[in-house]
């Protein structure tokens, strides 16, 4: 099976996200905090007349929070008609993956385990394939 994957860095790790889940890649400039929102919700931002709920991917994994920056790279995904921006450290490339998704055969931190769909081989490296929906749900989803 051939699948296009977006390679990004989150919490210092190179990971893959299926491009079918990705609407666009953007640089976020303005971020408005949301009082009493979950810790992994970094705030709200506007993009082409749409309001995006911005998710701190590091916090969503339960690994602290992303370093504050004036401009942040983000992946825009749409879930049930609601647009979200997932903050990432870097966007690397879109690659074609011809192999099947393999099960994870190593111990992962609970946050990574919750979002892992499996591992894929990209240019000789094994990368964790993550589920954007699970990342948006945040660390509270682990307790449920």
Where on the chain are the PLM-derived regions?
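An acidic, low-aromatic, low-complexity terminal/linker signal
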Residues: 1-144
């Amino acid at each position: 099976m051939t699948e296009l994957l977006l390679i990004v860095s989150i919490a210092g790790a190179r990971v893959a996200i299926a491009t079918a889940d990705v609407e666009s890649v953007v640089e976020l400039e303005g971020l408005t905090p949301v009082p009493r929102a979950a810790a992994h919700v970094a705030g709200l931002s506007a993009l082409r007349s749409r309001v995006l709920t911005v998710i701190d991917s590091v916090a969503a994994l339960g690994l602290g929070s992303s370093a504050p920056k004036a401009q942040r790279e983000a992946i825009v995904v749409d879930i049930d008609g609601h647009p979200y921006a997932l903050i990432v450290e870097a966007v690397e490339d879109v690659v074609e993956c011809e192999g099947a998704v393999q099960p994870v055969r190593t111990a992962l931190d609970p946050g990574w385990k919750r979002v892992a769909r499996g591992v894929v081989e990209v240019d000789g490296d094994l990368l964790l394939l993550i589920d954007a929906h699970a990342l948006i749900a945040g660390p509270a989803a682990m307790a449920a």
